[in-house]
């Protein structure tokens, strides 16, 4: 699951990543696309243990997110806390200049 938010200064991407280790995530930016890929390892099987129900997803994931504006590639911050990966991307000066309020006429 993924949310993308926006302020005047930055874009904020939040991705649910429960059980995923920081070292198992790779984040890249290219062609105005943010790519987040990684893997969630399955728990070690215990001898004699079987599941009544198993709904957790394991394995590799690869998300590509087209960004709605240009960002400054040198001002990106990522943090993994409580199973949520948060990536903050500062908008480029050009993107901020293009943003303007449009008046509505009657």
Regions found by a protein language model. Give the residues of each.
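Alpha-crystallin/small heat shock protein
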Residues: 1-106
